[in-house]
């Protein structure tokens, strides 16, 4: 069955609007070359809800090219408070720089994403659930994020582990969304969440480059 049967376009998808400049911004990425890379941008309102307002979804990008595209898309954005990237991107192959190092050298800041799969899936379920107090979910997606909207409701459960999704499915946007949700645990008090944002903002993403 579908892993996220609670996803409902009428509840979770909204038409784009101008995101307030003072809402903290998040960026999360799942990198691929032969398979698609997905980068998601989110903003956090003052009630702690995440609004996914932009996506980049394509394949065949080197780390350098992807970083350049990200920089161009963020030209008019405020500074990203937290940017998380698939931890595998820090793995070196041969003597050259890793994907993460290449992207950092080209002006995009990152820290490794929390890749705990089951807690990440649970956190996304919490975000998709309708809050009894507000009658609204804690996650909204702009209608322009077509690949996230297309793939999220179709991801099946794993046949070998019912607590996880099928990793052979088109899960690139899901992984990026999961990484983002894990930066914003819904169980934390609001003050703790924003204190964590401030802490992470000044945490070096890479000891070599000091970002």
Name the predicted role of every residue range:
Residues 37, 81, 174:
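Residue-level detector of short, conserved catalytic/binding motifs and their immediate flanks
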Residues 167-189, 193:
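Acidic, Mg2+-coordinating catalytic module of metal-dependent nucleases/exonucleases
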Residues 46-165, 187-191, 200-203, 207-211:
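Mg2+-dependent endonuclease catalytic cores in nucleic-acid-processing enzymes, primarily RNase H-like
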Residues 37-43, 178:
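Short beta-strand scaffold segments in enzyme catalytic cores
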Residues 34:
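Conserved Rossmann-like nucleotide-cofactor binding loop
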Residues 1-31:
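ATPase catalytic-site recognition across NTP-hydrolyzing enzymes
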Residues 2-14, 195-211:
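Amphipathic alpha-helical surface "interface" segments used
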């Amino acid at each position: 069955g579908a892993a996220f049967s609670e996803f409902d376009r009428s509840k979770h998808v909204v038409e784009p609007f101008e995101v307030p400049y003072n809402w903290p911004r998040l960026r999360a990425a799942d990198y691929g070359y032969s398979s698609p890379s997905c980068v998601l941008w989110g903003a956090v309102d003052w009630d702690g809800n995440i609004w996914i307002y932009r996506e980049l979804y394509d394949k065949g990008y080197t780390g350098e090219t992807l970083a350049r595209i990200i920089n161009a898309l963020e030209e008019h954005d405020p500074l990203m408070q937290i940017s998380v990237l698939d931890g595998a991107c820090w793995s070196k192959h041969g003597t050259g720089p890793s994907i993460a190092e290449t992207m950092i050298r080209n002006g995009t800041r990152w820290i490794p994403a929390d890749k705990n799969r089951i807690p990440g899936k649970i956190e996304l379920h919490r975000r998709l659930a309708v809050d009894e107090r507000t009658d609204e979910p804690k996650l909204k997606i702009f209608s322009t994020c077509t690949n996230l909207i297309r793939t999220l409701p179709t991801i099946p459960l794993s046949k070998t582990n019912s607590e996880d999704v099928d990793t052979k499915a088109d899960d690139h946007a899901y992984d990026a969304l999961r990484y983002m949700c894990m930066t914003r645990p819904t169980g934390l008090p609001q003050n703790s969440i924003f204190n964590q944002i401030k802490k992470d903002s000044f945490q070096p993403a890479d000891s070599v480059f000091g970002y």
